[in-house]
Design a protein with these regions (language model features):
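Acidic helix-start/capping segments at beta-turn-to-alpha-helix junctions
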Residues: 9-33
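Substrate-binding/catalytic groove segments of enzymes
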Residues: 89-92, 103-108, 126, 134-138, ...
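Juxtamembrane interface at the cytosolic side of transmembrane helices
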Residues: 168-173, 177-201
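Extended, hydrophilic extramembrane loops/domains of integral membrane proteins
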Residues: 121, 127-162
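Membrane-proximal low-complexity regions enriched in glycine and acidic/polar residues
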Residues: 38-122
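The canonical Cys-X-X-Cys-His
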Residues: 1-8, 153
Length: 201
């Protein structure tokens, strides 16, 4: 996916944060170092190229929109940072598109570089089928079926759309627990105060 699609709202440091893909910090650093970014200016006033760091956003595969369109038959690959939330149907739609490639029905003619996808709007897509059985190897021996890989891709994209979702859920739980305890304390405090008032009356 990264060869065509950008993820401009995700940083390399997100890869080892809680709730993410569970890389170690060293692994995330190694992934970042595999890409180069333009930085600067330096002390001479010139821009320079350096390996990416954890604080950098994911490196874009193309320099600009025009370059991306030129490399993809005029189509601009959408940014995948928030794709799971931006598209109607979310991850279910993305999962279906990844597995929706098939031969066009009889009588349907496609232009060169266009593929038939039964779940894509208009049934035409310029992205070739990205998944095939056995494309990757899982360290735990999981069978690399198209369905399994599509599930993994959509799970990753859902995380990328909200990398801090788990942290927010934990914070929300703590806030609710705090409010419950506070409510109980206030209730018993008020009950004690009113019992004194009633006894005096």
């Amino acid at each position: 996916c990264a060869s065509c699609h950008s993820m401009k709202y995700v940083s390399y440091r997100n890869l080892f944060e809680p709730g993410g893909p569970e890389f170690t910090e060293d692994q995330a650093k190694a992934i970042a170092a595999g890409f180069e970014v333009t930085d600067g200016p330096n002390s001479d006033g010139e821009m320079f190229v350096r390996p990416a760091k954890l604080s950098d956003k994911f490196v874009m595969p193309f320099a600009n929109v025009k370059a991306a369109q030129a490399a993809n038959g005029g189509a601009y690959p959408p940014d995948m940072s928030v794709l799971a939330k931006a598209r109607s149907g979310g991850v279910d739609y993305i999962y279906s598109v990844l597995l929706g490639y098939e031969d066009p029905p009889s009588g349907v003619t496609l232009e060169d570089g266009v593929y038939y996808n039964k779940y894509m709007y208009g049934n035409n897509i310029k992205m070739s089928e990205p998944l095939s059985d056995g494309l990757v190897e899982y360290s735990d021996g999981t069978t690399a079926s198209k369905e399994q890989m599509a599930k993994d891709v959509t799970t990753f994209l859902m995380w990328a759309a909200e990398p801090h979702l788990e942290a927010r859920h934990k914070m929300g739980f703590r806030a609710i627990l705090y409010l419950i305890i506070l409510t109980i304390l206030v209730y018993f405090s008020m009950k004690k105060i009113w019992s004194r008032i009633e006894s005096e009356v």
